[in-house]
Amino acid sequence: MGGKREAFAARREAMGFTQEGLAAAVGVEFYTVGRWERGVLTPQPWRRPRIAKALDVSLEELNVLLDSPDLPQPVTGQVLMGRPPQTSLVPSSPASAVTADQVDASDAFGPEIAEHVRRSREEWLRVRRAAGARGRELTELAAWLYPVSKRAPGGHVLTGPDWLLDTPVELNSVRLKFSEVERPVSKLKPVDHVLPLTARGERYAGYSRAVRDLVRPRLLENRLSYRLLEVSQCNGLELTFGTTTFFEVFDIKECLAHEFKAAWLASGGSVPDWSALPLRSTIGDPFDPARMLMSPGISTLTIRKDRRGEHRFMMHQRDGRAVADGGGMCTVMPSGEFQPSSLAAVDVHNDFSLWRNIMREYSEEFLGNPEHDGAGTSSIDYAEQEPFRSFEQARADGRFRLWHYGLVMDALTLGASQRTVAVLDDEIFDRLFTGLVATNDEGHVVGEGGRTDMPFTSEAIDRLEPRLSASSLTLLRLAWRDRQLLLG
């Protein structure tokens, strides 16, 4: 085994690098530089040009640094980058030198790695929990990165070409198309700067894995999701979907959010420059489904239409301990991913319906029923099974009406979502939701005056505004603007 490379370590320090900093600069694991300096490892030839560049030396000078043992002997005529003569050139034995690429990370376990893992996770959690002075502050700051033409009314969220409708349309008029064609999207990378270290001292393979291990929300499951492929307003709103998985989309959204939060913290609370957002920059147009993997969930504002004109609406506060994203914010309800109830091919097609997805969310969030996740032995019979049968009947009678506003995008995560409104006659609402639960798996209902709902008034929306997510605030403002149409 070679001796300690004190000359190499001295050059690193002279250039202002910690061992971890040099490791990041040359693209190796954090413990590798320490092993180079102790003489345990020797960098492979193909890696040396990058090391030389980081240390601002020539390859020949780097070889001198790497071959200098800890017992120096004077040399003459050798000046390294203007520094005094260094040590004699006594190379370590090639037979005893081990390259970093030949050593498994498990060989390097010890206090050094444990401490670095601890710091990595601590910093990752600190950045992830950054929320700004107000819950949606970071989302609105992120919106400033994009031109005004890309922002929805109010400027809280983004919207793409043909995404948001000027006037809501009835849900039945929205046409859905399903495509079996595979349409690959370039992978978002590199993502090492937004991922913490595993217990082995290696980067997590994905953001969802890190959330599972370090945040541990009660609800985090990788299920099949419908993937947005095309949006068109030719002859009405038409949405084309394929399939993806929840984690594939979640990983992209959370990596983008984490990168923005880290840059925001580093800038002292200012809007980050694009140069500090390499992942976001590589995406380019975030509204292009060919460049950005999207699975737009469905969020529905539920309004109880009162015969006396005292209309009310439902709000939900998400529990940060239960959900992987959006914890602590108030949102319209019900809200959920656009997903089939199971992986079975029959369900992928049977559940490919906005209305059926919305019904399942009402069943879960309003009535507290278990999540319809394919755990049953057969497909859902929406015509006969309750509460779906009653939902269908109320809608057929014209007393449970639904409207679609199109799509918006959260500026922080670049996550797309569909915005819908449901208007139920008071008598129908009270009958369908007589078993309304105040608390469900994802959070609790927000009400006032001892009730489980809020008055549908401009004043109530204004009072709720600081607690609302950006996309829910946008939908509420649109619905209030269009209240005569929706409640007529």
Predicted regions, residues:
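Conserved Nudix-box catalytic region and its N-terminal flanking loop in Nudix hydrolases
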Residues: 308-376
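Short, charged recognition helix plus adjacent turn
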Residues: 64-83
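Alpha-helical and coiled-coil interaction segments, frequently adjacent to or embedded
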Residues: 77-307, 312-329, 461-488
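The alpha-helix within a helix-turn-helix
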Residues: 12, 23, 52
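NUDIX/MutT-family hydrolases
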Residues: 417-420, 431-481
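A short, Lys/Arg-rich alpha-helix, primarily the initiator
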Residues: 1-15, 49, 64-65, 72
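Short alpha-helical DNA-recognition segment
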Residues: 16-35
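DNA major-groove recognition helix of helix-turn-helix/homeodomain DNA-binding modules
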Residues: 46-62
